[in-house]
Amino acid sequence: MNITDIMNAIDAIKALPICELDKRQGMLIDLLVEMVNSETCDGELTELNQALEHQDWWTTLKCLTADAGFKMLGNGHFSAAYSHPLLPNRVIKVGFKKEDSGAAYTAFCRMYQGRPGIPNVYDVQRHAGCYTVVLDALKDCERFNNDAHYKYAEIASDIIDCNSDEHDELTGWDGEFVETCKLIRKFFEGIASFDMHSGNIMFSNGDVPYITDPVSFSQKKDGGAFSIDPEELIKEVEEVARQKEIDRAKARKERHEGRLEARRFKRRNRKARKAHKAKRERMLAAWRWAERQERRNHEVAVDVLGRTNNAMLWVNMFSGDFKALEERIALHWRNADRMAIANGLTLNIDKQLDAMLMG
């Protein structure tokens, strides 16, 4: 689209008779959309991870819109607002991403027209490379120079961004504005991010606040699941809510299964530790019994052989052979005691005591 086409379109709009002045809005929108579609190739050149200032076509589009008489009032990450002398007291907002959270908020505004804080939406359309919204012309928020602007900006930021309830005691129009902020928070919670800074609230000439764009953009290529039709938006929000419930249920199931598996793992480990402890105690008891038995065998062998002979054998024999010898001597000693008990004879210990105490 060149400057000649633009000027011809402007001349055609200016030439409209008084009875057809209501067509100006639609013709200006068509002209602006045609310039956007021409520069962005119907949105194909729009990079979703870049701000407008970093788009290759942005500078050229600014020049074309300025040549057509459009005045850019400001721009966000994916949208810009324009005014035109042929459309007084109105602003055309252009969203360069056909379906995003801004379009969803526009549909929300259409659903709740007339509520305090909700801007008036006179027209909304989706095009090949963008969407357009016609709104009232509003003033920027002078947060630090106007007490009323500061108050309403704080209320909107506290409720929408932080879900605060410190303003619940407000009544009258302010109370209705608080309820609108809560409604926005409830409607978009979980499906969009909130970005309620002072640039997203504007004021009329009478300092009436209007929340213009409290939800932030998405970088998904398909533009997200938002629509500019209210009924479709409600269905999509309900679907998102259902999907959120499903995701929460799946997450609960995963956590439950994780806890069950953790309990099974702890139970297996507890049983294994208990079995290992019992085995260790059995092995320790067997080792202690064997050690005491070896000591008893040694004492019996010393009594039978004498301490000197036992020591000489210990020196001249391998340790295994010496231990086996002491076991055989102790076994013979015990068997002899059993035979003595069976035959009513004196025990070996009695013989030792007789020898020790004799005389």
Swiss-Prot record:
Molecular function per GO: ATP binding; protein serine kinase activity; protein serine/threonine kinase activity
Functional summary from the UniProt entry: Serine/threonine kinase that modulates host metabolism to favor virus replication cycle. Participates together with gene 2 protein (gp2) in the host transcription shutoff. Phosphorylates host RNA polymerase subunit RpoC and to a lesser extent subunit RpoB. This modification seems to increase rho-dependent transcription termination, which may help to switch from host to viral RNA polymerase transcription during phage development. Phosphorylates host components of the RNA degradosome rne and RhlB, leading to stabilization of mRNAs synthesized by T7 RNA polymerase.
Protein's name in the database: Protein kinase 0.7
Catalytic function, reaction form: L-seryl-[protein] + ATP = O-phospho-L-seryl-[protein] + ADP + H(+); L-threonyl-[protein] + ATP = O-phospho-L-threonyl-[protein] + ADP + H(+)
EC assignment: 2.7.11.1
Residue numbers of Phosphoserine PTMs: S216
Enzyme class, UniProt record, top EC level: transferase
Domain of life of the native organism: Viruses
Origin species: Escherichia phage T7
A GO biological process held by the record: symbiont-mediated suppression of host gene expression
Coiled-coil regions listed: 231-283
Keyword Hydrolase: no
